[in-house]
């Protein structure tokens, strides 16, 4: 990271910048020594020929898709999918055309049970992000076939700062915390200012313990409506109707 709040592109020589509204609120964190160390680490992994996901231009895609003042709800994930072609910078989301991961299938099951919305034919959650749902992983990069490979390298401090900044500088947001990891990360959230919804992780290993049936999507909209932020449209268009201009840009592919 440098003085411009930029991150090294892990798949090319170019640099990318944090979206301007986020840079104004959290960009100073990118100047910290641990973020410079992270930048050096990512550069070294690239030089070593390691495949790092998502591509560099999509590392900050969650912020690009959901500017600071447009955030209504936050879904916290752990780290990106580690299979080739899956991750594109939004937690739980995969690029159009990729098979649906098991956790996302359970999210869609709950969406249908809660709101009656039929499962889409793709796993791209970019429409949610564009409507104000920050889809934030705690760790923003991973290596091919190695889940958690970049944990403890510096991303957690940055994303903790993002959560804390939203907690302090915004009001009336909904934080959807699925699983113990997300719930630990969300301990700083002031429940007098925001709604915190907790459930087990949607993984097949735990979804039956309370994620399925949690009704978080309708509870989120009920709270947002009561606090004047406007409800989230949780519907997802069919793959053929996704905005090709967006999907061919830096965020989704």
From Swiss-Prot:
Excises uracil residues from the DNA which can arise as a result of misincorporation of dUMP residues by DNA polymerase or due to deamination of cytosine. Its EC number is 3.2.2.27. Its main location: cytoplasm. It is found in: Cytoplasm. It comes from Xylella fastidiosa (strain M12). The lineage of its organism: Bacteria, Pseudomonadati, Pseudomonadota, Gammaproteobacteria, Lysobacterales. The keyword Membrane does not apply. This is Uracil-DNA glycosylase. Belongs to the uracil-DNA glycosylase (UDG) superfamily. UNG family. CDD domains: UDG-F1-like (cd10027). It comes from the Bacteria. The active site is at 79 (proton acceptor).
């Amino acid at each position: 990271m440098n003085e411009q709040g930029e991150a090294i592109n892990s798949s090319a020589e170019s640099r990318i910048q944090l979206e301007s509204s986020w840079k104004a609120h959290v960009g100073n964190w990118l100047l910290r020594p641990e973020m410079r160390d992270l930048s050096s680490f990512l550069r070294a992994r690239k030089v070593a020929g390691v495949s790092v996901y998502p591509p560099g231009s999509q590392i900050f895609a969650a912020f690009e898709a959901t500017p600071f003042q447009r955030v209504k709800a936050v879904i916290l994930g752990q780290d990106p999918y580690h299979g080739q072609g899956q991750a594109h910078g939004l937690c739980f989301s995969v690029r159009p055309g990729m098979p649906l991961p098991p956790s996302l299938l359970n999210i869609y099951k709950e969406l249908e049970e809660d709101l009656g919305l039929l499962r889409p034919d793709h796993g791209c959650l970019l429409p949610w992000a564009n409507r104000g749902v920050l889809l934030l992983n705690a760790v923003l990069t991973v290596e091919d076939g190695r889940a958690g490979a970049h944990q403890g390298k510096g991303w957690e401090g940055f994303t903790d700062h993002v959560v804390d900044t939203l907690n302090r500088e915004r009001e009336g947001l909904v934080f959807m915390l699925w699983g113990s990891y997300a719930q630990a990360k969300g301990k700083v959230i002031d429940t007098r200012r925001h709604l915190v919804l907790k459930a087990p992780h949607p993984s097949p290993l735990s979804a039956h313990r309370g994620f399925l049936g949690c009704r978080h999507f309708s509870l989120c909209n009920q709270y947002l409506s009561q606090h004047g932020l406007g409800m989230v449209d949780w519907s997802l268009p069919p793959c053929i109707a996704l905005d090709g201009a967006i999907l061919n840009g830096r965020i989704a592919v």
